[in-house]
Amino acid sequence: MAKKHDQKSHVDTADHEARGLEDEPRPRMKNKEYEHELRRLHGELVAMQEWVRASGAKVCIVFEGRDTAGKGGTIKAITERVSPRVFRIVALPAPTEREKSQMYVQRYIPHFPAAGEVIIFDRSWYNRAGVERVMGFCTDHEAQRFLELAPAFEKAMVDAGIVLLKYWLEVSADEQARRLESRIDDPRKVWKLSDMDLKSYARWDEYSRARDEMFAASDTPWAPWYVAHSDDKKRARLNIITHLLSVIPFEPIPKKDVALPKRDIKDVSGPHGAAPPPRDIPTPF
């Protein structure tokens, strides 16, 4: 059974973590320990999934954070053992000209969860308070107006029965630099590096101010922000999964006893048997 968690914000109590500081940094988690804990948590996520499906719950999880903070890896860790019919990931591209003419949050609304769904936003409507504001894609007035409206918008979501969780993954300046350098040097990661990443990297303080203003304006009792320090990606993933399982008030669904039925396998070789496949793939391994 999930432990119910109050919706008290972690922004004030973990303010030093939001700035990439820890009193006593812990050693990075070893792979063996990480895989053991993740396997256990995957079982709990599947149990939560079955409750969501059976109860018709609607869950929306928002992930925000600086570039390289680990949003994508965290989302992958959450979703790799659950059904894509229940868990859906939404990562919207830059708005089209038509979308730019609409109410700002309008393009996100069609992706909100229906009954029995968990929707995960890999960046969200908070782009307006972060990257759009810092990089000049919106005016200060537009950003401030968004921050004024966001609490009411999210209150409407919660009042409609959506369980809304908002996570900010905070990476330190040194760790962000290390991760960006690895993207430059590693041919497997070079696709992750964009011109926007480099421009954003140079504006650390501007992003910090935008983050703090976002927290101040949109950290509410009904939709609080939760901060996860993510210099150690493995610990961050486990901490986030553990937390969301504690906040979502799911109840395990009793399992039915299942056994494989008897199966009649006939010899299908011969002139009336099944035709062989047209070709096999090579087997170099």
Regions found by a protein language model. Give the residues of each.
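Glycine-rich phosphate-binding loop of ATP-dependent small-molecule kinases
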Residues: 1-285
